[in-house]
């Protein structure tokens, strides 16, 4: 290896080459620059050679001295010193002042990639019950999002739009126009107003409309929760297993349990429901119903990946099972959501999918108007359950809904909400990273009302949510979102029910105080980070 890094240029008192002038000074500067570039190249080259040679030595064994390396590779001492420093920074060697360089001791065994234990959620819940499944009515998971927080408490647990985001003027105008319609207070058709059924059918079918439901396939319901209750009662008898996403909306679990059904979890990842575990759950339980939220799933915000969409419907069709598609968040897309995938029901000629949606989330908690869409004989069973449960949805509400969605204010409202939710989402995510980095976030969803965060291992969920409420911020515990043992402690943090970004900042500050009290020691949950 030729000698590099040594350049000798005699310099006179004036800083130029002895006996020269400006030309000699330029020559010297160029020579120095070339020397610097050559030196850097030599360091990298020597480090590469030594990196291979060090494997010949045992851990802890001394390498040749710097002098020997200078002689062997014909480089400068500076080059040797820098190459060894680079290898020390990489953990290949250890340098000891005055004693030389040694091969580094091997580090501990690499941490193996975590295994995937998601299948256990299916296995632990798949056993056939020895007797009838007891009916249980537990509304605690639902009441968390419905209860009014105490005065002064910031609402991170809300499931509806803040009043400032609701279309109050448009709703008032729609109600006024609806009240003037002929027969507004007469009894409506039990299936719903034909015009409203047709509007929902067009929304489900999307542009083009081929392959989607028609108005005759739609039933008007008193909101999404009512539609879900009707669907589960119609599709699964008491004692039957019902496949659900894990985690999932507590209100759905409450409906299934109240009907005496047995929820069986199918895990969700970043791309939505996992088809292979869905198929495994069908085989293990004999279930004939899956309830899923393919778009901005509650609580994870996941969107069912394109390649999984057809797979889920195919698996269900081959098993003779129904897919209940809860499309609650289609109107809750954020400004940066891009083009949304169509509903599963938009291309379902075989009637596998029972679709439900609602106007409530995008308007007001009190506009409880939704829809069920299905094809084939199942529609008759849905209709029968629907009539027995509620007769019909009050006509003034249906008329008001028609007036609202048919007004110029409707598309403006959708755009306004999309524009308002994105900065709230981004601000909450940023404040959590800044103030409470111990709460791990997945990728922020581009639709819906909330973030799903994981607390450090060892966190007491009840203690954390209690501490948050004492600090002045209401958060939603994650445990009610699982029908089997949860894999970790989670919180659902909403941003749509807040007044704006300033309130979000204050809410996270209060949550940081709660984390300092309730997170395991050393979790780093309560340390303020400068803005």
Mark where each language-model region is.
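PLP-dependent aminotransferase class I/II
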Residues: 353-435, 442-443
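Conserved core of the PLP fold type I
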Residues: 182-319, 331-347, 421, 523, ...
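Conserved active-site segment immediately N-terminal to the catalytic lysine
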Residues: 338-360, 380-381, 491
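Short hydrophobic/aromatic beta-strand micro-patches
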Residues: 373, 452-454, 494-496
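N-terminal basic, amphipathic alpha-helical segments
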Residues: 1-176, 383, 387, 393, ...
């Amino acid at each position: 290896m030729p000698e590099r890094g040594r350049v000798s240029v005699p310099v006179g008192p004036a800083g130029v080459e002895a006996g020269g002038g400006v030309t000699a000074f330029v020559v010297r500067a160029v020579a120095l620059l070339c020397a610097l570039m050559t030196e850097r190249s030599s360091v990298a080259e020597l480090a590469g050679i030594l990196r291979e040679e060090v494997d010949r030595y045992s851990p802890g064994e001394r390498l040749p001295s710097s002098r020997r390396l200078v002689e062997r590779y014909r480089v400068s001492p500076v080059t040797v010193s820098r190459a060894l420093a680079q290898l020390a920074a990489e953990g290949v060697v250890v340098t000891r002042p005055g004693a030389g360089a040694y091969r580094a001791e091997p580090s501990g065994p690499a941490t193996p990639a975590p295994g995937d234990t998601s299948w256990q959620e299916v296995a632990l819940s798949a056993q056939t019950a020895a007797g009838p499944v007891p009916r249980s009515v537990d509304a605690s998971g639902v009441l968390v999002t419905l209860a009014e927080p105490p005065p002064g408490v910031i609402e991170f647990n809300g499931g509806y739009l803040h009043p400032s985001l609701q279309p109050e003027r448009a709703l008032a105008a729609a109600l006024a126009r609806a009240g003037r319609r002929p027969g507004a207070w007469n009894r409506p058709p039990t299936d719903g107003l034909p015009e409203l059924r047709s509007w929902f059918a067009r929304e489900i079918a999307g542009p083009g409309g081929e392959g989607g439901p028609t108005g005759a396939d739609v039933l008007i319901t008193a909101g999404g929760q009512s539609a879900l209750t009707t669907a589960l009662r119609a599709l699964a008898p008491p004692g039957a297993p019902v496949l659900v996403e894990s985690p999932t909306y507590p209100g759905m679990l409450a409906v299934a349990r109240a009907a005496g059904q047995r929820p069986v979890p199918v895990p969700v990842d970043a791309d939505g429901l996992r088809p292979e575990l869905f198929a495994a759950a069908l085989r293990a339980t004999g279930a004939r119903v899956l309830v899923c939220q393919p778009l901005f799933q509650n609580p994870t915000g996941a969107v069912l990946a394109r390649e999984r969409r057809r797979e889920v419907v195919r698996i269900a069709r081959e098993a003779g099972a129904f897919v209940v598609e809860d499309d609650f968040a289609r109107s809750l897309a954020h400004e940066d959501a891009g083009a949304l995938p169509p509903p599963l029901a938009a291309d379902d000629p075989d009637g596998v999918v029972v679709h439900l949606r609602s106007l409530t989330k995008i308007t007001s908690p009190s506009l409880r108007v939704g829809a069920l869409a299905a094809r084939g004989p199942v529609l008759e069973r849905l209709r029968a359950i629907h009539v027995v449960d509620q007769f019909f949805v009050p006509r003034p509400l249906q008329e008001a809904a028609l007036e609202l969605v048919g007004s110029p204010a409707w598309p403006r409202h959708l755009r306004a909400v999309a524009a308002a939710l994105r900065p709230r989402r981004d601000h909450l995510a940023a404040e959590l990273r800044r103030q409470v980095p111990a709460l791990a976030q997945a990728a922020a969803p581009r639709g819906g009302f909330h973030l799903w965060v994981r607390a450090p291992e060892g966190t007491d969920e009840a203690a954390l949510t209690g501490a948050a409420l004492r600090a002045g911020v209401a958060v939603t515990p994650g445990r009610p979102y699982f029908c089997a043992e949860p894999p970790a402690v989670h919180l659902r943090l909403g941003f749509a029910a807040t007044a704006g970004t300033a309130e979000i900042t204050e809410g996270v500050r209060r949550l940081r105080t709660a984390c300092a009290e309730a997170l395991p020691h050393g979790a780093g949950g309560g340390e303020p980070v400068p803005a």
